[in-house]
Amino acid sequence: MSKTILRVEDLSVRFRTEEGVFNAVDNISFTLEEQKTLAIVGESGSGKSVTSLAIMQLLAENGHISSGEIYVDDENILNMSSSQVQHNILGKKISMIFQEPMTALNPILKIGDQITESIIEHQGTGKKEAYEIALDTLKQVGIPSPEQRIKQFPHELSGGMRQRVMIAMALVTRPKIMIADEPTTALDVTIEAQILNLIEQLKSTFKTSILFVTHDLNVVADIADDVIVMYCGQIIERGPVVDIFENPQHPYTKGLLATMPTLEDHKGELPTIQGGVPSITQRPGGCYFHPRCPHRMKKCETQSPGVYTVGQQQVKCFLFEGNKEERNDGK
Amino acid sequence: MFKKNSFYDFAYRRFTRNRLAVIGFAVTLFFVIMALFAPLIAPHEPSEFFFVEGQNVYDKYAAPSSEHLLGTDSLGRDVFSRLVYGARVTMMVALLAVSISTVIGTVIGLLSGYFGKIIDNIFMRLVDIVISFPVLFLLISISTIMDPSIWIVIFAIGFVSWTSTARLVRAEVLRVKELDYIAAARACGTSNLKIIVKHILPNILAPIMVQVTIGTAQAILMEASLSFLGVGVQQPTPSWGNMLMDAQKLLVLRDMPWIWIPPGVVNLLLVLAIYFVGDGLRDAFDSRQ
């Protein structure tokens, strides 16, 4: 049994809006094991990005963590002061890769200045030494002629190169956890494959655990060890990646997987899930998925289902009521 | 001139392609040189009184001649020399006042925009109060209470004109702080101070620089109007504003254009030139072009 490196318990994130207060993330719990990749999958508005931002304490001004605990190395970071988190956690134990390599680099700072920033901040090394480490990291993320690149500005690099720089920035302090928020969405497919390979390879060289947030199931199949499927701020299914893909249980997961195009069949239109994710202000009662669910029952409209074990998976759906119940809130 | 392919390198290239901006820059530079080398250019001391040949009478209101290129003023002083030295005073007042207002405005704008909430509220109400000050009356009352000096003019202009810079900087911070690279910097554990100084400030420097040029032009105009009304730069120190004071006399206004046209024209020229530079900078920094 490997060590748990990140443990999120009963996390709820609340947003204040014009129309009231809403839970963007609703009582979710999960763990990330050492040197594993956990993928959080979901459509837009499912709360997957909010979860990662909450862990990084980067929530927008109108959002806050209303309850729950986030343990990094068995320390609850929500009990720390913001300067403690900034000094001891962010950039040191957890780092993040952003979705848009075009905008996530400061346009007027040279690559080198941006990478060395967190080394100087966290390890107190001199500028020269930090520069050497940065150069070394750039080599490891596969940037050709890093001596030259390190002196360039972000706009002189291609999208793929910039994402490599982002990864170098995230890895330069050798964090234990790397959160990747759709890191390949903005890239084209060939570059995407390269970046995924790189992340995979760096995971073993740097012994990092990865929390991978994405909506792209192909990427999940490629990279994840375990998968969490989110819908409307709740975890509706979780399990090892093989089980989720071979044998999805929740009607939503089944629907998602059915929408994936395959190379074999060319039978015209792709299947879709009816309807769309309800907005945070208009979530239905009972199971949030029931209006779109092909198997909905009467009680789905009024009661929220518990979480039931099916093989290696945990599913939040009444279809599996006969199975062993885990907890009512998603652990 | 700048690091190749940097933001400022591109801006420099765009600026130099803008003819009006380059002319404006040249005119501004001309006046700056005039101010710097005033003792070499001016034929006389600015406060030197001239007498009518062989008499013990001031040579007042003398028409332009080879001796006095732009004639003499109401006290028999050489207008051209005062004009040259006046460039010094006018520019010093404008630059120091703009430095004060830029520093105050930038600091307040940064804090207000970055931290938001109550800090923002306090500072923005302060801005509202300062904007509502009747500047002219304030200055007139200050100059009647205190001994008028050039420093009062500088601080007065500085302390009333930082509000537009503060608002501009605040708006820019609000825009920039939502960008991904600020979140990325925060995700690296960068401190607030460092994010403000290293990531936000350099990225909003361009609009601040535009604001500085426009602020300089406005400060020159403000100095001119204050001095014209007698509450700005005091005699015998020459400034383009107080040189225009003589024009308050109908006789001078009607019959002695050499006394008031030159300071008025240079004032106009310099302000216009600085505005052209400001416009040029704004276009040059606009990377969408």
Regions found by a protein language model. Give the residues of each.
Chain B
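Glycine-rich helix-loop "coupling/hinge" segments at transmembrane-helix boundaries
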Residues: 143-145, 157, 173, 222-266
